[in-house]
Amino acid sequence: MLLFVQLTFAQMNPFTENLVPVNKLIDGTLTIPENIENPPLVILIQGSGPTDRDGNQMMMKNDASKKIAHQLAENGIASYRFDKRIFKMNKFKIKEADLRFEDFVTDVNSILEYFNADENFDKIILAGHSEGSLIGMLAAQQGADAFISLAGPGRSIDKIVVEQLAKQSEELSENARQAFVEMDKTGSTTNYSPYLESIFRPSVQPYMRSWMKYDPALEIAKLEIPILIINGSFDLQVDSTDAEILNAAAANSKLVILKNMNHIFREIKGESLENTKAYNEPNRPLHPELIPVLTDFIKSIK
């Protein structure tokens, strides 16, 4: 039986939302559709950085995960979205230098275990966004009924970062490439530009090193469950070719590239400026095809 800390009745919406702490590091919101017995449950895994359960960061509010949760509920699908453990690190005196990529996988495994112990949900699906895609792949190997990659990279993070930087500066891109090589060989690096401090500062290097050792294409190939791979054609952070790499590696996958969808699931009809502005526009609707694609896949799982 689930322990609900708080119950909020949605008077105008066909769902209820409950605040559910899984453990001392994981707080989240369980969204349950009304009048649906044993609905499927989607666990939404956030992307990189200090991202909260709704898909927001400081000075960047778009409510991407919140919107997905609510619209899935309108289609009879439950979901659990949660704050990353980053928000609890200060409280429990966890240092940045002690954080590893595997910690986030452990968190998702804890959530899986928590909800697998409940009998209110017919299926449990992991859906990971961006960095959360790889986290979800690794956690799904421990038990899930299906997996959804939302704008998930198909290559290791060092290759993604080097490619992203090349769009801004070839010099910085090459500097990052060399720093990653040194970090991989020796465990750390000091030969990086001050402009790359956010990626290579000493306290974050152990995390980056633990992350870059995973090749998403190799990890998704280990899954024998149904897989949905979604990317947008206007994603400036993760190119649709990454989705194609994942699809080629997966044994049982469906690939969907949504036209003009950006990294946070919005339809962009203008240029790059509109794309960037969308990251801080919570009232901008989700891409119109996203929820139908998700719903069709989830309801097709046997």
Please describe what each predicted stretch is.
Residues 11-37:
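N-terminal cap/lid segment of alpha/beta-hydrolase-fold proteins
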Residues 36-38, 42-72:
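Short, surface-exposed "cap/lid" segments of acyl-processing enzymes
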Residues 65-91:
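Conserved alpha/beta-hydrolase
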Residues 96-118:
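Alpha/beta-hydrolase active-site loop
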Residues 146-218:
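Accessory cap/linker subdomain of secreted extracellular hydrolases
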Residues 223, 229-231:
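Short beta-strand/loop motif that positions the catalytic acidic residue
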Residues 225, 238-249:
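Short alpha-helix in the alpha/beta-hydrolase fold that links the catalytic acid
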Residues 264, 270-302:
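Catalytic active-site module of serine/aspartate enzymes centered on a nucleophile-bearing elbow/loop
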